[in-house]
């Protein structure tokens, strides 16, 4: 398991993890590798929903500047991968509070007042309740995303 080629969102350490992991897998005789990614299309949709909620006065947790910054970052091609490229989608809503706590614990990566941590619980779960993966050895080619990382 390594990050996608862009490191999820262009993070240089994550890009290096991808390079080293893929190289190791190849040197070890072609060990299967899965890439952890973010669903660029799902994140963009979540931002669009937040913009609409903010405009209607519902998203009191967000502000216009924050939303515009998020939108700009999600438009970059090095941010995650397109839904059509993602081969696996695993529901993690059963552990969503632990996921949020883990993100919060990475203070060097995510500020306490970040867009992600400011979301209400329901919005956070809808946005981050799925973990996304790519099996680079098996392009999706229109198939439904699998929810089983080991067998499919």
Specify the residue positions occupied by each region the protein language model found.
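Metal-dependent de-N-acetylase/amidase catalytic core
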Residues: 1-152
């Amino acid at each position: 398991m390594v990050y996608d080629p862009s490191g999820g969102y262009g993070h240089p350490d994550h890009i290096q993890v991808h390079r080293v992991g893929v190289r190791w897998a190849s040197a070890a005789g072609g060990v299967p590798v899965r890439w952890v990614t973010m669903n660029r299309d799902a994140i963009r949709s979540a931002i669009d929903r937040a913009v609409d909620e903010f405009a209607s006065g519902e998203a009191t947790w967000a502000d216009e500047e924050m939303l515009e910054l998020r939108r700009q970052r999600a438009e970059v091609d090095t941010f995650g991968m397109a839904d059509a490229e993602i081969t696996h989608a695993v529901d993690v809503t059963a552990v969503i509070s632990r996921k949020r706590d883990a993100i919060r614990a990475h203070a060097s990566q995510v500020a306490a007042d970040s867009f992600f941590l400011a979301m209400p619980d329901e919005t956070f779960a809808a946005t981050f309740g799925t973990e996304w993966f790519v099996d680079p050895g098996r392009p999706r080619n229109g198939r439904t995303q699998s929810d089983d990382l080991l067998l499919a």
